[in-house]
């Protein structure tokens, strides 16, 4: 077993060696290095063939038509293109959008920008389990609502929203539905042939593919129109100009092909690892699981260790790569906005750690990690006067602290 141990698979995943091999073949002079837009010679034709093959592989994982897959630089760009693209194209129909308070910053910062442009956005508060229900969305719908954007799997707490039920509602009301699927590919079955989803964002690097490449599913039936954000050579049917990065695209295609083949077996194995980890830490006092216990992916275990500061616990777990909050926002010392939206108090939100397991996690690593967590939590609590007061039966929430 090699240290440190990587338990932050929701932040990014290592590229699968099979994916890396396919990518290398598209880089050098001996390989498939041409520009897919070069129509006048064989180098371009071969590159275009590789790009279209990858498009089919991505479409196959999510049961879409390959013509509905638009290449982007990642899920952040896909979210921007979907939300701004719809808002700007359909602004004459209405200027109201609906999303939730627990979305990724790539959605929330995009809607904030639209608010500055004069759009109105309703931010739905989730239940204590972190889930967004169709009834919550129904209550927020207005005559001028043009788009609902709700994530499939939450990046911090791993909860799975019922996008099938939400899609039925939005379609019946004639409102477009965008789903951020960055965290769900390879973890949850996605059948866009039957789901009433109009737009869906994907990322390669959360599914053992390379960083810097993603895709946006844009429904053809019913047809969805978008205003482009990148202008240039008219690539991707005018929706996203820019020379296609063949090696990145081929990597994403191969990653999604592997995900389709291995997802069922991999999920069973990862659930066993997650259960194994939880069984070894669940006897710690004042331990809370954040998010629904049932509607969640097995890869994610977000735990709050009351009376332990999350950042100090991460420091104590120097052999484990884990995070507090999402990788995109954990640089700030604010408690997780996702956990706050669930109704967790600041103390519990600050004491949360996200453990995420993946393809290369082993039982040996899990056992070592669980042992280290138990030792660190016990040691840090022994140093905490708040823990002593709690053990003495003092209700800490009733204490009035003196101002300095």
Curated annotation (Swiss-Prot):
Catalytic activity from the UniProt record: (sulfur carrier)-H + L-cysteine = (sulfur carrier)-SH + L-alanine
Places the protein is found? Cytoplasm
GO molecular function annotation: 2 iron, 2 sulfur cluster binding; cysteine desulfurase activity; metal ion binding; pyridoxal phosphate binding
Pathway assignment: Cofactor biosynthesis; iron-sulfur cluster biosynthesis
Active site as annotated:
328
What are the alphabetically sorted keywords of the record?
Answer: 2Fe-2S, Cytoplasm, Iron, Iron-sulfur, Metal-binding, Pyridoxal phosphate, Transferase
For biological process, the GO terms are: [2Fe-2S] cluster assembly
Question: What EC designation does it have?
Answer: 2.8.1.7
Q: Which GO terms describe its cellular component?
A: L-cysteine desulfurase complex
Pfam families assigned? Aminotran_5
> In which residues is [2Fe-2S] cluster bound?
328
N6-(pyridoxal phosphate)lysine is found on 206
Q: Which cofactor does it need?
A: pyridoxal 5'-phosphate
Q: Where is the signal peptide?
A: none
Lineage: superkingdom: Bacteria
Q: What does this protein do?
A: Master enzyme that delivers sulfur to a number of partners involved in Fe-S cluster assembly, tRNA modification or cofactor biosynthesis. Catalyzes the removal of elemental sulfur atoms from cysteine to produce alanine. Functions as a sulfur delivery protein for Fe-S cluster synthesis onto IscU, an Fe-S scaffold assembly protein, as well as other S acceptor proteins.
Which family does the record assign? Belongs to the class-V pyridoxal-phosphate-dependent aminotransferase family. NifS/IscS subfamily.
UniProt subunit comment? Homodimer. Forms a heterotetramer with IscU, interacts with other sulfur acceptors.
Q: What is this protein called?
A: Cysteine desulfurase IscS
Gene responsible for this protein: iscS
